[in-house]
């Protein structure tokens, strides 16, 4: 009978949804498209007399796209070729005013310490003040990177060269009188995109910032339109459970593992329908200050499948491989 044949049903992510693809995959194509859009925006402003709002909007779209690219590149799932993966990671970082090694190392710490007020760098980004100011708090990543001494090998040099490039651009803008363009058509779009990234990558997926259990420290809020607009970040829990899944496979991975998530009691809504939750959100928009109290350790599955020592000391590629090797343990069997 069908019931007997399905008595033991493994719930795992299909292998074809995991791992970095090669050749012209969606992430690489999106990076190239973002670069092309930004070049058109610059040429449209300086050479073709396009409307300011058109150039501004194009830059916002380009920066929004590379926000997902740098995220996948930090997990080594932007491209199977490590050189290409690093190249588009550094390119995206330059467009966003980030440093790729800083973003990657700090992001790995976030994965190891989700919702830990002391060790999760994104916890401060999300809860360190009003939500409308969240973009500026991304600069805390750099403070965290140096305070924890997270760099390895040539990453300090990479950081220096990236910051030197930004400084050289600003200096050139001052010398040739286009600093106003830099502010209005780069810094302001960065603030807009930073707000969106902070909201959809950090704040909404992890609120109310209390759960440490790996199955409950993030959430999903399924919606096919949002999946396109924010490139899968409404399935953020899927990313935390299986970091080797590229962004464009979050949604199919969610539906493939929905029974597993149900069995684990995972959060599968935005979590703002209750009156109390809604007013907490309003508070965070305008004020967002929290006072953290020491809590006793919780006997839960921890958020860190690998040790902090490995994350802070190992080469980035090894950290990604460690994450991938441990993902196979996250499936369960449901018995009738």
Model region roles, listed by residue range:
Residues 66-76, 103-115, 202-208, 229-245:
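Histidine-centered catalytic micro-motifs
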Residues 61, 223-233:
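Long helical/loop segments within the catalytic core of UDP-sugar-dependent glycosyltransferases
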């Amino acid at each position: 009978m069908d019931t007997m044949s399905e008595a033991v049903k493994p719930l795992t992510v299909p292998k074809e949804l995991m791992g970095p693809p090669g050749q012209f995959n969606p992430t690489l194509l999106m990076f190239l498209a973002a670069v092309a859009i930004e070049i058109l925006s610059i040429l449209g402003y300086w050479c073709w007399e396009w409307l300011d709002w058109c150039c501004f909007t194009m830059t916002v779209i380009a920066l929004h796209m590379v926000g997902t690219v740098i995220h996948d590149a930090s997990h080594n799932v932007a491209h199977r070729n490590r050189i290409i993966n690093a190249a588009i990671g550094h390119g995206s970082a330059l467009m966003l005013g980030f440093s790729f090694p800083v973003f990657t190392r700090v992001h790995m710490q976030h994965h190891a310490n989700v919702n830990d007020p002391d060790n999760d760098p994104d916890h401060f980004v999300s809860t360190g003040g009003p939500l409308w100011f969240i973009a500026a708090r991304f600069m805390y990543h750099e403070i965290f990177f140096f305070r924890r001494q997270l760099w390895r090998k040539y990453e300090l040099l990479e950081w220096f060269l990236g910051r030197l490039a930004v400084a050289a651009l600003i200096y050139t803008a001052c010398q040739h009188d286009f600093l106003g363009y830099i502010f209005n058509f780069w810094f302001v779009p960065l603030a807009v995109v930073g707000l969106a990234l902070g909201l959809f990558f950090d704040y909404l997926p992890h609120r109310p910032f209390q759960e440490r259990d790996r199955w409950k420290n993030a959430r999903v809020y399924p919606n096919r339109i949002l999946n396109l607009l924010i490139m899968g970040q409404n399935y953020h829990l899927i990313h935390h459970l299986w970091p080797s899944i590229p962004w464009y496979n979050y949604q199919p991975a969610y539906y493939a593992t929905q029974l597993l998530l149900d069995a684990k009691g995972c959060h599968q809504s935005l979590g703002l329908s209750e009156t109390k939750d809604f007013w907490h959100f309003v508070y965070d928009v305008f004020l967002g200050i929290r006072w953290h109290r020491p809590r006793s350790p919780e006997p839960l599955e921890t958020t860190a499948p690998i040790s902090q020592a490995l994350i802070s000391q190992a080469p980035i590629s090894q950290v990604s491989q460690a994450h991938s090797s441990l993902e196979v343990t996250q499936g369960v069997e449901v018995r009738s």
